[in-house]
């Protein structure tokens, strides 16, 4: 135990002596090492009073940037086995204890003052500072707890593996080796390993390789460096390479080439045999011949060898620039930043420019073909035709009936002939003239209508005293309306074919005027497809189309307001009224004067004639009550309410077009000479006038025109009775007042007008021919007190030849029979009563 302690004390003393020598060197030679600045926050660092100089505090010495070495000086100097831990304080080293620190720790203890117990005792010894175990012979393990099993060797202190002594092999070194002196035994396998220069199984053959080793099994020479040949007797001449061991060819090192590897790689190449190319080194600088490294790279490249392009979206020096966006999402060039690829039809740094100058495709590398009246598509090169043409080269005009882009739209013209570009309809010469004439006509008509409105508005502002004037002075507005209607009939006819004209509607109402005048233009060409229309059809007051009749009737309010005034005026004239003399005009005369207005009136359609006669009579009866009473003085109408407003006709027998055709029209159109065998005057168009074509003349103009006295045609008187009008007779009876007669006729007119829109089939024409006989009989009975000449005229039937020319006259004959029946019954009623 003591021997062991003395052996352990020697190394400790030597370690302490080395520590003291180090401290002495640091003390004596402080200037050998450059002093390091102290850290103001380091351990034991103080400032000199009165200055900012940093220094170690008292009792401490600098170590690095702080003061970590304690100084024990003077009487406090530490002994050999002591360590200064604080200024003037010493402690025993690890492994020693005692008052003077001169006693070594026992084997089972270690550490400061020998306070730590050793865990590897008693098969080992702990190190004084760390406590690590050092096992005794034949022991191994972390705490020396395992016994060594090697028979002819030692155990590894950590793993326990056997280390066999020479001549022994195996896991526990229990097998002996049988090798010659020129070999050694393998401790794992027991095989003999020949020494250098010997070969064979027993290593008893010497190598003949010129001092070079040979293979142990075959004896083949393994030449040393820079030697080659079968016996390694030839010298290698490769400067920067290795020789082949058999033929001596050189295998050059990286960066050299040539037969003897004496030529360095040219610029831009590196590697074995200079077969690899350098990357994009900046300025054509050579790369390292061995590894191919570049100092700096060209713009757009990076990597140690400058062989990698910039990442997507970056370009330029060091790949530090971000690419601007390219059209259609393409990436830019990693060197220049420009777009690398553009879609077909686009070029430019950002693919923002279309192909021009007749080019198309990728990079605008293709030339467009001739596209005629079109242009080339900058992407595909296909011809895009302008409106009106088509075809692969845009040189074919659109066929008839088509227009627009690629001739894909159909023309809307009736003749299917339109402009191939715009689709506008072509107008022929006569059509253009028709449109121009229609425009001029509309302008003229608008001017006339405005004049009429101004006149009517001026008449409305008259004071109440003007209303009390005689009925003769009130005829001016009525005459003006009739004149305007006749002027419109005289306007020329303009063929418009299928062209449409705007519709003009002007309505006028004048409280002073007892007529309510309305003017409507005819339906459009599509609604009424007639080749032409006249002003008569346009502004006739007796239109009976599907859009409704256009007429002039006494206004109800105006009639009611003026009824008292007219009744008073009528009473003053009744006393002087008697049978009309030969020289005065009669209702038959009025009917004869009406058709003689103009040729243009006779050329109007046969639909408006009969109805126009009735409307004209209604207007005259309202405007001239005194004269009407004078003419109707011979009749005595029943004062019963049902006679004032007769019931409407039976819808089953009502004609489709008008309820006042036939004999009334014939009588209105008949001139003053005897009607037998007489024909109507021809119209300007060359057509013969029929009773249905008779026109109506405004009452104002008819009254002003004087004419010779003529007997009233009996058919006209019969028709007047059929319509509810009073006619002069020889028998004097109480005359009906003009307002009452006008009200009755207006009510009957409204009832008849409402039934015009109903589309019933008219009765057969054969039944209408027999309607004359009852009317003639009733007319003879009711006119028994008339003069002899008037009775003869009433009993004589009117000629039927003109009425047979137009089929439209036949339905009204039945209506005339029904209308004539009611007045006849009304005429007999007073006699019966």
Curated annotation (Swiss-Prot):
<keyword id="KW-0677">Repeat</keyword>
<keyword id="KW-0325">Glycoprotein</keyword>
<feature type="disulfide bond">
    <location>
        <begin position="150"/>
        <end position="162"/>
    </location>
</feature>
<keyword id="KW-0812">Transmembrane</keyword>
<keyword id="KW-1015">Disulfide bond</keyword>
<feature type="glycosylation site" description="N-linked (GlcNAc...) asparagine">
    <location>
        <position position="395"/>
    </location>
</feature>
<feature type="modified residue" description="Phosphotyrosine">
    <location>
        <position position="615"/>
    </location>
</feature>
<dbReference type="InterPro" id="IPR002049">
    <property type="entry name" value="LE_dom"/>
</dbReference>
<feature type="disulfide bond">
    <location>
        <begin position="164"/>
        <end position="173"/>
    </location>
</feature>
<feature type="disulfide bond">
    <location>
        <begin position="148"/>
        <end position="155"/>
    </location>
</feature>
<feature type="domain" description="EGF-like 7">
    <location>
        <begin position="364"/>
        <end position="395"/>
    </location>
</feature>
<comment type="subunit">
    <text>Homophilic and heterophilic interaction via its extracellular domain. Interacts with SCARF1. The heterophilic interaction with SCARF1, which is stronger than the homophilic interaction with itself, is suppressed by the presence of SCARF1 ligand such as Ac-LDL.</text>
</comment>
<feature type="disulfide bond">
    <location>
        <begin position="252"/>
        <end position="261"/>
    </location>
</feature>
<feature type="compositionally biased region" description="Basic residues">
    <location>
        <begin position="804"/>
        <end position="816"/>
    </location>
</feature>
<feature type="domain" description="EGF-like 2">
    <location>
        <begin position="114"/>
        <end position="145"/>
    </location>
</feature>
<feature type="topological domain" description="Cytoplasmic">
    <location>
        <begin position="455"/>
        <end position="833"/>
    </location>
</feature>
<feature type="modified residue" description="Phosphothreonine">
    <location>
        <position position="712"/>
    </location>
</feature>
<feature type="modified residue" description="Phosphoserine">
    <location>
        <position position="600"/>
    </location>
</feature>
<feature type="domain" description="EGF-like 4">
    <location>
        <begin position="175"/>
        <end position="204"/>
    </location>
</feature>
<keyword id="KW-0675">Receptor</keyword>
<comment type="function">
    <text>Probable adhesion protein, which mediates homophilic and heterophilic interactions. In contrast to SCARF1, it poorly mediates the binding and degradation of acetylated low density lipoprotein (Ac-LDL).</text>
</comment>
<keyword id="KW-0472">Membrane</keyword>
<protein>
    <recommendedName>
        <fullName>Scavenger receptor class F member 2</fullName>
    </recommendedName>
</protein>
<feature type="domain" description="EGF-like 5">
    <location>
        <begin position="205"/>
        <end position="233"/>
    </location>
</feature>
<feature type="disulfide bond">
    <location>
        <begin position="72"/>
        <end position="90"/>
    </location>
</feature>
<feature type="domain" description="EGF-like 6">
    <location>
        <begin position="228"/>
        <end position="262"/>
    </location>
</feature>
<feature type="disulfide bond">
    <location>
        <begin position="135"/>
        <end position="144"/>
    </location>
</feature>
<feature type="modified residue" description="Phosphoserine">
    <location>
        <position position="640"/>
    </location>
</feature>
<feature type="disulfide bond">
    <location>
        <begin position="209"/>
        <end position="221"/>
    </location>
</feature>
<dbReference type="InterPro" id="IPR042635">
    <property type="entry name" value="MEGF10/SREC1/2-like"/>
</dbReference>
<feature type="disulfide bond">
    <location>
        <begin position="179"/>
        <end position="192"/>
    </location>
</feature>
<dbReference type="InterPro" id="IPR000742">
    <property type="entry name" value="EGF-like_dom"/>
</dbReference>
<dbReference type="GO" id="GO:0005044">
    <property type="term" value="F:scavenger receptor activity"/>
</dbReference>
<feature type="glycosylation site" description="N-linked (GlcNAc...) asparagine">
    <location>
        <position position="302"/>
    </location>
</feature>
<feature type="domain" description="EGF-like 3">
    <location>
        <begin position="140"/>
        <end position="174"/>
    </location>
</feature>
<feature type="disulfide bond">
    <location>
        <begin position="118"/>
        <end position="126"/>
    </location>
</feature>
<dbReference type="GO" id="GO:0007157">
    <property type="term" value="P:heterophilic cell-cell adhesion via plasma membrane cell adhesion molecules"/>
</dbReference>
<feature type="disulfide bond">
    <location>
        <begin position="177"/>
        <end position="185"/>
    </location>
</feature>
<feature type="disulfide bond">
    <location>
        <begin position="368"/>
        <end position="376"/>
    </location>
</feature>
<feature type="signal peptide">
    <location>
        <begin position="1"/>
        <end position="33"/>
    </location>
</feature>
<keyword id="KW-0732">Signal</keyword>
<dbReference type="GO" id="GO:0016020">
    <property type="term" value="C:membrane"/>
</dbReference>
């Amino acid at each position: 135990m003591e021997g062991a302690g003395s052996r352990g004390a020697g190394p400790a003393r030597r370690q302490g002596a080395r520590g003291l020598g180090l401290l002495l060197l640091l003390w004596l030679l402080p200037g050998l090492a450059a002093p390091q600045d102290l850290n103001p926050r380091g351990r034991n660092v103080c400032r000199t009073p009165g200055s900012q100089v940093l220094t170690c505090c008292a009792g401490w010495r600098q170590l690095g940037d702080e003061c970590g070495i304690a100084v024990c000086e003077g009487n406090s100097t530490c002994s050999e086995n002591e360590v200064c831990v604080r200024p003037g304080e010493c402690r025993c080293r690890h492994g020693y204890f005692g008052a003077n620190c001169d006693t070594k720790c026992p084997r089972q203890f270690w550490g400061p003052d020998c306070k730590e117990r050793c865990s590897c005792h008693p098969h080992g010894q702990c190190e004084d500072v760390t406590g690590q175990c050092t096992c005794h012979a034949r022991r191994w393990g972390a705490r020396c707890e395992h016994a060594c099993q090697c028979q002819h060797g030692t155990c590894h202190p950590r793993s326990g593996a056997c280390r066999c002594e020479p001549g022994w092999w195996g896991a526990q070194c229990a097998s002996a080796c049988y090798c010659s002196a020129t070999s050694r035994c393998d401790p794992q396998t027991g095989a003999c390993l020949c020494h250098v220069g010997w070969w064979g199984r027993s290593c008893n053959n010497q190598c003949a390789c010129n001092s070079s080793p040979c293979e142990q099994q075959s004896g083949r020479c393994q030449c040393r460096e820079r030697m080659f040949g079968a016996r390694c007797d030839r010298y290698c001449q490769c400067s920067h390479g290795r020789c082949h061991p058999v033929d001596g060819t050189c295998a050059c090192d990286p960066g050299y080439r040539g037969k003897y590897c004496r030529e360095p790689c040219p610029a831009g190449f590196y590697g074995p045999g200079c077969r690899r190319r350098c990357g994009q080194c900046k300025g054509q600088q050579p790369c390292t011949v061995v590894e191919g490294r570049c100092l700096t790279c060209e713009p757009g490249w990076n990597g140690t060898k400058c062989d990698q392009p910039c990442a997507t979206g970056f370009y330029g020096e060091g790949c530090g620039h971000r690419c601007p966006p390219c059209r259609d999402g393409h990436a830019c060039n990693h060197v220049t930043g420009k777009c690398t690829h553009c879609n077909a039809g686009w070029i430019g740094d950002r693919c923002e420019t279309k192909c021009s100058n007749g080019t198309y495709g990728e990079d605008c590398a293709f030339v467009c073909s001739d596209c005629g009246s079109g242009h080339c598509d900058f992407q595909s090169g296909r011809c895009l035709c302008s409106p009106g043409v088509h075809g692969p080269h845009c040189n074919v005009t659109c066929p008839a009936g088509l227009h627009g882009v690629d001739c894909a739209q159909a023309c809307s013209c009736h003749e299917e002939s339109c402009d191939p570009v715009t689709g506008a309809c072509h107008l022929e010469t006569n059509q253009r003239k028709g449109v121009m004439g229609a425009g001029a006509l509309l302008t003229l008509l608008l001017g006339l209508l405005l004049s009429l409105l101004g006149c009517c508005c001026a008449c409305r502002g008259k004071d109440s005293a003007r209303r009390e004037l005689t009925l003769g002075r009130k005829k001016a507005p009525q005459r003006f309306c009739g004149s305007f209607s006749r002027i419109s009939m005289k306007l020329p006819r303009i063929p418009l074919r299928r062209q449409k004209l705007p519709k003009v509607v002007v309505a006028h109402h004048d409280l002073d005027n007892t007529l309510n005048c309305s003017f409507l233009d005819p339906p459009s060409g599509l609604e009424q497809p007639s080749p032409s229309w006249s002003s008569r059809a346009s502004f006739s007051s007796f239109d009976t189309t599907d859009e409704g009749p256009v007429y002039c009737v006494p206004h109800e309010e105006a009639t009611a307001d003026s009824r008292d005034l007219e009744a008073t005026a009528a009473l003053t004239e009744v006393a002087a009224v008697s049978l009309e003399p030969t020289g005065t005009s009669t209702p038959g005369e009025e009917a004869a004067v009406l058709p003689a207005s103009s040729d243009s009136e006779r050329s109007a359609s046969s639909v408006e004639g009969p109805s126009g006669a009735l409307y004209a009579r209604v207007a005259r009866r309202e405007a001239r009550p005194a004269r009407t009473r004078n003419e109707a003085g011979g009749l005595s109408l029943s004062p019963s309410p049902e006679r004032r407003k007769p019931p409407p006709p039976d819808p089953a027998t009502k004609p489709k077009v008008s309820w006042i055709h036939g004999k009334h029209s014939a009588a209105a159109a008949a001139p003053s000479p005897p009607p037998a065998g007489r024909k109507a005057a021809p119209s300007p168009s060359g057509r013969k006038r029929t009773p249905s074509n008779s026109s109506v003349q405004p009452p104002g103009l008819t009254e002003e025109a004087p004419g010779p006295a003529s007997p009233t045609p009996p058919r006209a008187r019969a028709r007047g009775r059929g319509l509810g009008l009073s006619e002069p007779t020889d028998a004097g009876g109480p005359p009906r007042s003009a307002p009452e007669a006008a009200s009755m006729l207006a009510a009957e007119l409204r009832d008849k007008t409402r039934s015009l829109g109903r589309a019933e089939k008219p009765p057969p024409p054969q039944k209408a021919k027999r309607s004359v006989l009852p009317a003639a009989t009733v007319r003879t009975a009711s006119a028994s007190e008339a003069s002899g000449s008037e009775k003869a005229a009433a009993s004589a039937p009117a000629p039927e030849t003109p009425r047979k020319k137009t089929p439209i006259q036949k339905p009204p004959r039945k209506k005339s029979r029904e209308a004539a029946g009611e007045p006849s019954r009304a005429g007999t009623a007073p006699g019966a009563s």
